[in-house]
Amino acid sequence: MNDAAKVRVVLAPNPSAMTGPGTNSFLIGEREVAVIDPGPDDPAHIDAILELAEGRISHILVTHAHLDHSAGVARLAQATRAPVFAFGAADSGRSPTMARLAETGLVGGEGVDAGFRPDIELRHGEELRSSDWTLQALHTPGHMGGHLSFRLGDAIFCGDLVMGWSTSLISPPEGDLVDYFRSLDLLARLAPRVLYPAHGEPIAAPLPRLEELAAHRRLRSAQILAALDAGPGTAADLAARIYTIPAHLMPAAERNVLAHLLALADLGAVAGNGPVRADLRWQRAGG
């Protein structure tokens, strides 16, 4: 797949500890323009997208249903009449494990656009074509069950699977660490020339970055096991033992730790003292 379509970006004015400099809304092509991630519901941001596209938006693509990516869809779709493409609704694409946890009432929900629905659902490998670009949908769950990346020639728009400035939040039941590793492996096997993350600058050396992220998660799992050697604890307890970060970031760290614990439980390395919930106490298996 070789595609030299023009790529432009409009940075949303939503910087934060979780979004970095803000959400990147990408515009692909010139004669017919595809917008990847309209971003937050910010009128000035949507106007900036419309101005840059010069009235030629034909497709609206959404990597996943978090408010900083999908909340602007309705405003942009109303202005352009362009169809909206995504994997599915906000709760779509969950692994069987995460679907079962959601049914028990386990809540993640950070920034989820619960009412999001695309006009057209995409599946892994499907292609969208225009007169000057071809985009292939890649199902890349991990950060969220219905997360899509989009392949344009030797470039991949990777949403929040890979960030240009930090690691991604994995918050069950939306996020799944097992899926995350599989998705990193998928991108590595595709060997893109460049990754365009939804937050941060383009990644010109994708393979080292993908390897770095996988190694970081493996190290975090090892740290959690070491922390459990000191005694059982909840995800919050373990996060406090492991992380040295500002207090306002600790809730996200606790969700990441829970994701690791669930993956370690699948491997038989840890066990909880009851049904999975946010305040479940965990210990080393057999301990």
How would you describe each model-predicted region?
Residues 2-52, 149-164:
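Conserved beta-strand hairpin/beta-sheet module of binuclear metal-dependent hydrolase folds
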